[in-house]
């Protein structure tokens, strides 16, 4: 079964060339890559102008689950559109299909080429500054370390940036993905070393060098590093499956309570770090935990599939709502709903069945354009 946490063998065939050469870029120095310090990546909970979704599932990757993946994306799209505008990127020949599945209320469609559905990883990282200007950062998507063909997806960040008003998006010297970035919008980030300090993306880079570049690109003053784990999923343990900022000083973390899961030890280690960490302003973090369901519903997506990754951390915060998953485990689903409702009291928690994409999740298949413009 092809899920996000599976190494997709039939399409992982980019090899034999240097990383920079394969991307068609030069890995220029930190000074050239750095954004002006006033630029920052907003917290997801700040007002959004619109959300994004990439309707890019194809049978070469998803096989017999393609229609199910599209249907799951449709549920996500329609839920978002109840609260704010949504743009769906889609292929020209699937434009009508995308609208039939994702709807027309509050949804616009932009035709472009795509390899897959993971818009969080392949899209532009939109930044803002104190003057109200909009910028964007492109982290040179390389298929999570050349594990999947990605030539079309690699072009989406620059395409989306220009489409929404950023004539010259900044291209980082780093290779990485949006799902590997978590920020509070006030100078603190959480990242996993397994994703960023990895030779399949950034060969020869030390953690210190990676940190300097991320700080410069995203307007960060401090990064809290979690170890993650390399090689167990296609992303090398993106942070958006492990820890999320609710607001500055408050974090919700994934805590796997199943001793048989490799994530049991990983999440315990992460929790220990987060409980003693301080943010850029010196505050000790208030840490809440959400545990994956121990009894998710039996389905053809989860059956005999050790890579099925059911977790509640991968939710998407939008204007007025939190779009979150449910997995058919009444106790765990209710616990997730209750905690998220308490953490986001001004937002409605909307839980959706997304089993077909639960090797990734709702956060992985969405991204956002922040509200920008100089305040009155």
Regions found by a protein language model. Give the residues of each.
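N-terminal export signals
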Residues: 6-28
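The feature marks the mature, well-folded catalytic cores of soluble enzymes
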Residues: 32-376
């Amino acid at each position: 079964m092809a899920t996000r946490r599976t190494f997709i063998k039939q399409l992982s065939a980019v090899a034999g060339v240097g990383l920079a050469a394969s991307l068609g870029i030069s890995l220029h120095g930190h000074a050239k890559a750095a954004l002006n310090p006033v630029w920052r990546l907003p917290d997801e909970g700040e007002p959004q102008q619109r959300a994004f979704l990439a309707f890019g599932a194809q049978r070469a990757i998803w096989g017999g689950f393609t229609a199910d993946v599209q249907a799951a994306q449709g549920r996500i799209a329609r839920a978002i559109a109840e609260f704010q505008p949504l743009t769906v990127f889609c292929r020209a020949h699937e434009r009508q299909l995308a609208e039939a599945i994702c709807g027309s209320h509050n949804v616009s469609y932009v035709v472009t080429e795509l390899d897959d559905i993971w818009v969080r990883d392949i899209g532009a990282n939109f930044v803002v500054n104190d003057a109200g200007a909009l910028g964007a950062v492109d982290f040179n998507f390389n298929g999570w370390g050349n594990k999947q063909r990605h030539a079309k997806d690699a072009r989406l960040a620059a395409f989306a940036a220009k489409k929404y008003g950023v004539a010259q998006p900044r291209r980082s010297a780093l290779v990485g993905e949006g799902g590997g970035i978590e920020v509070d919008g006030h100078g603190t980030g959480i990242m996993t070393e397994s994703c960023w300090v990895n030779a399949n993306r950034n060969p020869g880079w030390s953690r210190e060098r990676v940190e300097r570049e991320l700080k410069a690109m995203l307007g960060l003053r401090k990064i809290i590093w979690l170890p993650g784990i390399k090689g167990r999923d296609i992303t090398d343990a993106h942070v958006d499956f492990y820890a999320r900022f609710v607001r500055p000083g408050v974090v919700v973390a994934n805590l796997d309570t199943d001793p048989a899961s490799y994530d049991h030890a990983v999440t315990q280690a992460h929790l220990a770090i987060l409980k003693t960490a301080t943010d850029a302003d010196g505050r000790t973090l208030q840490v809440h935990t959400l545990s994956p369901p121990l009894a998710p519903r039996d389905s053809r997506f989860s059956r005999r599939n050790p890579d099925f990754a059911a977790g509640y951390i991968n939710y998407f915060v939008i204007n007025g709502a939190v779009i979150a998953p449910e997995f058919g485990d009444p106790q765990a689903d209710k616990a997730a709903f209750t905690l998220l409702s308490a953490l986001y009291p001004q937002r409605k928690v909307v839980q959706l069945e997304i089993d077909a994409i639960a090797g990734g999740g709702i956060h992985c298949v969405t991204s956002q354009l922040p509200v920008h413009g100089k305040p009155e």
